Regions:
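Targeting-peptide/extracellular-domain and disordered-appendage signature
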Residues: 1-214
């Protein structure tokens, strides 16, 4: 049975991962945040997609600068992930420089794009009880999100989901590339070069594993 301490880091595991996904009510924009902890080192990803706009991508792989809880302060950025009420509410934030990618697949390579300052301020609220999965749990919710860009603040509310696993990294279950030809793409790369493709479709976020970057 899940207990409130399960929301936080487990000291006896080699790896632990927290992931959140969100979309606006009309599906025209969405965001994600991923955080994977390995001892005192970590990987961090965040992204924001909008119809007709470049993909905004943030990554910090094999980072250092872990503070108390799930707060991180590597060079040139800050992020925090705060459990306000166990299984009910999380607060996610960052202050970083992201890259705007006209070609989302550039995130699989060197992520060359236009560098821009960005701030995420996301409140995640549960809309149901967590469901146990292998090595952790998943949960549905909703968000109140504000993404601050150079042109101003983009705000949206809408459905959300999250996953928390420990003892293993979070990896999508499929090894086939997405068949969706429409949607907002938000791919990312893991620190071992594995490509993960994510697409915000009219049904929800889909994410699958692709081949490692050569």
């Amino acid at each position: 049975m899940l207990q409130p301490p399960d929301e936080h880091a487990h000291a006896d595991v080699a790896v632990e991962a927290w992931w959140w996904w969100a979309a606006s009510a009309d599906g025209s924009q969405g965001a994600f945040v991923g955080f994977e902890l390995r001892g005192r080192r970590f990987d961090y990803w965040a992204g924001f997609v909008r119809a007709g706009e470049p993909y905004l991508y943030i990554e910090e792989l094999d980072g250092t600068g872990l503070r108390d809880g799930l707060e991180i302060k590597p060079p040139e950025m800050w992020a925090d992930h705060v459990c306000d009420v166990a299984f009910q509410q999380w607060s996610l934030g960052n202050e970083a420089h992201g890259v705007l990618l006209d070609d989302p697949e550039e995130a699989w390579r060197r992520a060359h794009g236009t560098v821009v300052p960005v701030t995420f301020d996301i409140e995640w609220y549960a809309s149901g009880e967590p469901t146990e999965i292998a090595h952790g749990y998943e949960q549905r919710g909703e968000v109140d999100a504000q993404i601050e860009l150079t042109e101003g603040i983009v705000a949206f509310t809408g459905p959300a989901s999250r996953v928390h696993v420990w003892g293993v990294p979070f990896m999508p279950s499929s090894f086939a590339m997405p068949v969706a030809t429409t949607g907002l793409r938000a791919p990312y790369r893991r620190n071992d070069g594995t490509r993960i493709d994510q697409v915000l479709t009219d049904r929800w976020w889909a994410n699958v594993i692709g081949p490692a970057v050569s």
